[in-house]
A protein has these predicted regions:
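Conserved catalytic cores of soluble enzyme domains
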Residues: 1-112, 116, 120
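C-terminal alpha-helix plus adjacent terminal tail
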Residues: 114-152
Length: 152
């Protein structure tokens, strides 16, 4: 009963939760705990937030045995809201604005809009199936046959 089990239980509970799930990354979401945020109908990020399964410092320590290369690791990991949105990993970016009041208004408006879209789902089973399929698409890849350049 450790961190791995806690993350797995969180993933399991979210995938079965019979209510809309919206995750918002507000700062730095990193390591295995951040993975649990991915099992949501919508994953959103504040414009300056970071989201990854490993911290840049941890990545640099593992890959290059040099934690001082964390800026290089961050670039390599593509952990910004803009990067993740372009990859289809998150559904939206919330602009932070210039004041906390503006940020709160932007978050409230975004949540209202996202909940309205989710409320338009025909039934809970459809929403759960879409949530499951969305989570299963994360990390989908193709292997390219180098000789023929055809997908294998």
């Amino acid at each position: 009963r450790g961190q791995g089990e806690a993350i797995a239980r969180c993933l399991y509970e979210f995938i079965e939760l019979k209510t809309p799930v919206i995750s918002i990354v507000t700062g730095e979401g990193g390591s295995g705990g951040a993975l649990a945020l991915a099992v949501a109908d919508r994953v959103l990020m504040l414009e300056n937030a970071l989201y990854s399964v490993i911290s840049p410092r941890g990545c640099a320590s593992i890959l290059w045995k040099d934690p001082k290369r964390e800026a290089e690791a961050a670039d390599t990991l593509h952990i910004t809201a803009q990067d993740l949105y372009s990859f289809g990993m998150i559904e939206g970016i919330i602009q932070e604005g210039t004041s906390s009041a503006q940020l709160i208004r932007n978050v409230a408006r975004t949540l209202r809009d996202q909940l309205a879209e989710l409320d338009a789902e025909p039934d809970i089973d459809t929403m759960l199936q879409k949530r499951y399929e969305k989570f299963r698409r994360v990390g989908v890849f193709r292997t390219i046959n180098q000789e023929s350049n055809e997908g294998v």
